[in-house]
Amino acid sequence: MDRRSLLNTSAAMAAGAVAGCALPGQAQSTAKTPFEVAQTTIPIVGSDQRFPVRRIYCIGRNYAAHAREMGSDPTREPPFFFQKPADAIQYVAPGTVADHPYPTLTKNYHYECELVAALHKGGRDIAPEQALECVFGYAIGLDMTRRDLQRGMGDQKKPWEIGKSFDHSAPIGPIHPIAKLGAHPSKGAIWLKVNGQTKQDADLSQMIWSVAEQISQLSRAFELKPGDIIYSGTPENVGPVVKGDVIDCHIDGLPNLGIRIT
């Protein structure tokens, strides 16, 4: 499926336009009634078209050292996933540092740098060896987390959506098509700095579950569709940020992602 087909297919999935957005990361609203909702989109590198976001899936504890620091045993048990709303996207253009609002209700706000896969095909029960055929391209992203709320809900045996799924909780750079990258990223440095100090420093090859395996596992629980994106997990040494901090994220082969906590 080419990029134009991707957008045409996804247009049927959501109300509102999928291209020509007024604001980066948010679609221009063509709503004629109060009940129509604008489509969230992300710029595509090398194209004037934009990637329409249907769902945001995230995998938890997909690097062994991070699993340990979160109190888990990093064995190859089936992975677990959670979701963020599509409008949690905050698009950040390469070469810029975007203002990112410190959220309400938290006193322990954490960064998590991640590789993001964007799908242009979907299905159910997708075999791992066929899963990468679903991937349109990749981006660098942040899974921002209200850690105190996440842990508090976990301690109470309650869903911790409030710690993960909130406004602006998914900063992301542009989508780089596979044709531009030349290959699916499976190794290479992934790091994050806060105010110039390295906090996270790992390699994509250290993922417990590869992107292909994540797609396969997800497709057993959900019917995946064009427009889905998958945050593929973060390395160890997650930690807090406060207002005024500047976060710089890097993945080899992709432009850095920068935000300032405001």
Short names for language-model regions:
Residues 2, 29-50, 93-96, 147-262:
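Catalytic-pocket segment enriched in acidic/His residues
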Residues 5-26:
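N-terminal export signals
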Residues 29-130:
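Extended, compositionally biased flexible segments
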Residues 55-57, 79-81, 114-116, 137-139, ...:
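Structural motif
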Residues 60, 117, 143, 172, ...:
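A residue-level signal for conserved active-site and pocket-lining positions in enzyme catalytic cores
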Residues 76-78, 85, 111-115, 134-140, ...:
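A generic structural signal for short beta-strands and their flanking turns/coil linkers
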Residues 83, 118-120, 141, 178, ...:
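Short beta-strand-to-turn element immediately C-terminal to the catalytic PLP-Schiff-base lysine
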